[in-house]
Every structure is written in structure tokens, then in C-alpha cells.
């Protein structure tokens, strides 16, 4: 990639040929001319038989193939009675050779009214040019869609002995707002989203191959729960009731375990009415998995295996680059309790400390805390500020205080703790897991304590869900649960530094 200075606006070009408005005006006129000539600028179909990649991969000098291919014009070189153009389809680019004598005068005249960005269909045969480029010699040529806006193809000019890039579509905010253009002109962006699809497909197949059932649960919920977060609210007119967009699907999936399924999972859109930054989007994708008769230790091994397989699938190796660090995802991952991690990175011991003592520790570390937050939140603040950013290689942080995890089963050997882990990679949480709490009496006590925290001003504390408690009272088997943020996982495995680079259409402020 060139290190030349970039000028993002075409008006910055030292000698622009025409303004953007003039370009669009000319394209509208070309559309009119095509229609007047009896040519539909937007026909209904074209029979495609192959792709650019398939043509190149299967090319043979001895056996030229008849092909029909379609794509967007990305470059044109006109030479009187013959022309070359490059078209781009979903798999790459291929050169087209267009000769007036072969396609006919009418088609060639149509071609003269075309621009970069127009979508065309070509039927012909494969050949290799004198320079060795595999190409398609056109016998038939058809316009499939007229582009009325110019595609921002990057160009270079030399100014005062220095290369200047202009018309490049590289402004991040503009790329996010007009992802459709971003995908056209930046092939690496398209590659990231193809990898995302592969990652999700691998995970879905991994879960299904174990016999677990993919399910769907409500997005609109009368009571939100399953995570500590603020919800989006809406109103159901017919029932005259307030509903919430789900913040997690945990409580409904556990109901299905009660109902007799041994394993269920769901790829879900969840919604949290919170801030937007490099790692958070209000609408995000996560997968949750619940497996009966398992615990969080078993789930750690599953996560190690799953992440390693996904990394090899998209990168062809055990490691990935993330936020400037090479991350090795070959199992086993390091395991560290949250108390041990805080002691290792701050020198402070949090075990057995009261809320007042934890506040003193936070103060000694230089943290300013909201006076309304409780012990669990204080520990979470200390961990998030002084420990999490330093955990670069994959690390399971385990055994959290009970207050931090009201839906997790109490630790089998450590009083006051629960069986929970978070996987931290590159200084960021990737997934969260519990040995799930299935004692309905203790679960009620935990949720009622959450209600008291809400009264103290914690608007992220959970609400008592009576129907969920009723389900537990019928009996839920021992169960391990897992939640993986798909967007974070894709960031990790594709080396992206912003969640907006792995979501097709991230939330943006109004233009």
C-alpha cells in the first residue's frame, strides 16, 4: 500500500476534469439516450454460467471455454474499434476484450455510453492476452444496470514530484454510512465479511454436530434479563403493554433445558441501550449455548477447541493479529481466578474484603467510584481498569464473587464465589460462561437481592422474573451455559480494531 498523502475529496485533485454534479448529469443523460435507443438500462435477467475466479482457476490454453459472466465495470480502456474493460463480480475481477466486429455495431455503440460502475453481462470464450492475462473475448454484450453515481476509484497523480492519491474511498465514517460503496471499492472489506460468514457457519456446524438444537426465542420480552444492561423499550398497542428488546436470551434458553432438551443454542440479535465505541454497538450478535449435565470446566475445553478451529479455518494457522499483538489460540489457555489476577497486576488482595475495604483499595489505586455501587461492581471496576487491558494472550478469568453473577451456581469449594469464567483475549472479553444456577430457592434469593440493588440506584441490576423461577421449580438438570459475542470474535479472528468493521451497517449518528 502506498504511503503517499491522500486527498479524499475529488475537488482536491489538482486538475479535476468535471465536478461530481456534472458527472451525475452526464450519466443521467446517457440513461436517457439508452432508453431513446430502445435499450432498457435495467433489464430483468442475465444467464450467468460462471464467475471470474472460476474462469481463472479452470483456464486452459488448449481448451478455451464458452462462458457467460457478469459484473461491475471497474476499468475501461477504449481503442477505437476495440476496447478492454475489467469487471468485478462477487469473487474477483476478470478482463473483457470487446471488439466491434464481434459484438456488432449496435452493441458497441451501447458500450460507448457506459461508465465505470455500470453492471454488464458478457458471453464469449476464454483466452490469454499477449501479456499473459486470462480474459474473456466477448461475442455478446449487455448492459444490466446503469450506475448514476460515479464509483470513487482511487487514482494517483504526481504533484511536485510526489504521488498524490485522490478519489479514494477511505474516510471511515463515510465507509460505514455507505457500506455498499465500501464493498465495491475495497476488496479487503468484502473479505472480512466473507470470513464472518465462515466463522458463524463453523460454529453452527460445530454445535449441531454435537446433537444440540438450534432454536429461536422472543426478541420482544415483557421482562428483560440474562445480563446486566439497560434495555430499549417499546409499546405493544394491541395489548397496551410495555415490552423490551432482549438484552440476552439466557432465561428463555434455560426454560428449554427445563423442557427436556439436552442442548440448545441460538444465534441472536441482542440490544443494549448503552454507549457506542470501538467495541460496543447497541445492536449486536451473540450465540448462547446451554448443555445439560455439564459444568463450566467442561465448557472451557469446548471454548478452547472451538476458537482454535475457527482461527485455523479463516487464517490457516493457530494465531491471529489483533490490536497490534500476535495472539496464539492453540490450547490450552491460561486460567486465573479474578482474585489472583487482581493481586498479580495490582498487588492488592480482594479476598474476604468488605465493601468499605474494597472502596479503600480502589481509592489507593486511584479509582473514583460512584458511591451507589456495590462490592461486585467495585471488583469489576478494579479488574476492568488494571487487569483486563493487560491480558493479551487468551486467559480464562474464573471464580467471580457471587454478587457479580446472580445466575451462576455457587462454587463447589470456595464460599462466596460462583463457577463462572470470562475469556479475555487482546485485553477484551470474548465470551462468558457459568455452571448454571438451578436451585430455584437460591435463584429467588439472588434475584431479590438484585431488586434491592435496583432500589439503591443500580439500573443494570436484574428484575425478578416469576415465570423463569416457576420453570426452575419444575427442575432443571445441571447445566453449563456459554455466551460468545460474534462481533468481538470476528474482530479477533480477522484482525479488525473496531466493531464497526465487522458489522455491515453499524449504528451512526444522523448525518
Curated annotation (Swiss-Prot):
GO molecular-function terms, A-Z: ATP binding; lysine-tRNA ligase activity; magnesium ion binding; tRNA binding
Record carries keyword Mitochondrion: no
Gene (UniProt): lysS
Native organism: Chlorobaculum tepidum (strain ATCC 49652 / DSM 12025 / NBRC 103806 / TLS) (Chlorobium tepidum)
Assigned keywords, A-Z: Aminoacyl-tRNA synthetase, ATP-binding, Cytoplasm, Ligase, Magnesium, Metal-binding, Nucleotide-binding, Protein biosynthesis
Lineage start: Bacteria, Pseudomonadati, Chlorobiota, Chlorobiia, Chlorobiales
GO biological process, one term: lysyl-tRNA aminoacylation
Binding site for Mg(2+) 1: 422, 429
Catalyzed reactions: tRNA(Lys) + L-lysine + ATP = L-lysyl-tRNA(Lys) + AMP + diphosphate
Protein's UniProt name: Lysine--tRNA ligase
EC numbers: 6.1.1.6
Chief site of localization: cytoplasm
Cited InterPro entries: Aa-tRNA-synt_II, aa-tRNA-synth_II, aa-tRNA-synth_II/BPL/LPL, Lys-tRNA-ligase_II, Lys-tRNA-ligase_II_N, Lys-tRNA-synth_II_C, NA-bd_OB-fold, NA-bd_OB_tRNA
Gene3D superfamilies in UniProt: Bira Bifunctional Protein, Domain 2 (3.30.930.10), Nucleic acid-binding proteins (2.40.50.140)
Amino acid at each position: 500500500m502506498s504511503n503517499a498523502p491522500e486527498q479524499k475529496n475529488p475537488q482536491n485533485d489538482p486538475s479535476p476534469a468535471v465536478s461530481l454534479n456534472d458527472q451525475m448529469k452526464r450519466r443521467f443523460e446517457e440513461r436517457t439516450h439508452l432508453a431513446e435507443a430502445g435499450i432498457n438500462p435495467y433489464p430483468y435477467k442475465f444467464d450467468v454460467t460462471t464467475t471470474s475466479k472460476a474462469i481463472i482457476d479452470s483456464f486452459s490454453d488448449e481448451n478455451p471455454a464458452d462462458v457467460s459472466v457478469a459484473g461491475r465495470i471497474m476499468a475501461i480502456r477504449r481503442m477505437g474499434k476495440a476496447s478492454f474493460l475489467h469487471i468485478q463480480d462477487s469473487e474477483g475481477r476478470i478482463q473483457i476484450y470487446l471488439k466491434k466486429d464481434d459484438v456488432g455495431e449496435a452493441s458497441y455503440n451501447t458500450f460507448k455510453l457506459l461508465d465505470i460502475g455500470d453492471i454488464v453481462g458478457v458471453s464469449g470464450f476464454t483466452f490469454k492476452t499477449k501479456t499473459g492475462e486470462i480474459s474473456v473475448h466477448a461475442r455478446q454484450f449487455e448492459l444490466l444496470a446503469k450506475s448514476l453515481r460515479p464509483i470513487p476509484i482511487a487514482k494517483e497523480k504526481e504533484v511536485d514530484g510526489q504521488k498524490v492519491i485522490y478519489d479514494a474511498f477511505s474516510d471511515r465514517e463515510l465507509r460505514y454510512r455507505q457500506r455498499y460503496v465500501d464493498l465495491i471499492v475495497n476488496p479487503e472489506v468484502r473479505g472480512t465479511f466473507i470470513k464472518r460468514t465462515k466463522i458463524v457457519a463453523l460454529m453452527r456446524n460445530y454445535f449441531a454436530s454435537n446433537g444440540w438444537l438450534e432454536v429461536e426465542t422472543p426478541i420482544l420480552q415483557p421482562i428483560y434479563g440474562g445480563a446486566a444492561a439497560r434495555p430499549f423499550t417499546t409499546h405493544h398497542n394491541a395489548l397496551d403493554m410495555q415490552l423490551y428488546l432482549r438484552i440476552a436470551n439466557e432465561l428463555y434458553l434455560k426454560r428449554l433445558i427445563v423442557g427436556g432438551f439436552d442442548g440448545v443454542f441460538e444465534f441472536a440479535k441482542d440490544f443494549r441501550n448503552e454507549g457506542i465505541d470501538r467495541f460496543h454497538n447497541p445492536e449486536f450478535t451473540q450465540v448462547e449455548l446451554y448443555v445439560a449435565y455439564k459444568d463450566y470446566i467442561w465448557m472451557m475445553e469446548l471454548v478452547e477447541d472451538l476458537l482454535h478451529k475457527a482461527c485455523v479455518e479463516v487464517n490457516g494457522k493457530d494465531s491471529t493479529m489483533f490490536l497490534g499483538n500476535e495472539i496464539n489460540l492453540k490450547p490450552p489457555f491460561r486460567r486465573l481466578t479474578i482474585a489472583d489476577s487482581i493481586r498479580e497486576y495490582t498487588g492488592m488482595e480482594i479476598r474476604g474484603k468488605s465493601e468499605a475495604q474494597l472502596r479503600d483499595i480502589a481509592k489507593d489505586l486511584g479509582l473514583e467510584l460512584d458511591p451507589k455501587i456495590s462490592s461486585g461492581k467495585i471488583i469489576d471496576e478494579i479488574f476492568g481498569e488494571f487487569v483486563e487491558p493487560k491480558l493479551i494472550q487468551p486467559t480464562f478469568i474464573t471464580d467471580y464473587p457471587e454478587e457479580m453473577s446472580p445466575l451462576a451456581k455457587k462454587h463447589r469449594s470456595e464460599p462466596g464465589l460462583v463457577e463462572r469464567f470470562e475469556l479475555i483475549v487482546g485485553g477484551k472479553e470474548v465470551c462468558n460462561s457459568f455452571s448454571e444456577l438451578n436451585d430455584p430457592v437460591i435463584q429467588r434469593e439472588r434475584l431479590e437481592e438484585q431488586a434491592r440493588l435496583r432500589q439503591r440506584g443500580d439500573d443494570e441490576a436484574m428484575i425478578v422474573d416469576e415465570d423463569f423461577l416457576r420453570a426452575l421449580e419444575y427442575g432443571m438438570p445441571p447445566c453449563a451455559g456459554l455466551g460468545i459475542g460474534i462481533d468481538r470474535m470476528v474482530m479477533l479472528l480477522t484482525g479488525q480494531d473496531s466493531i464497526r468493521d465487522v458489522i455491515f451497517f453499524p449504528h451512526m449518528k444522523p448525518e
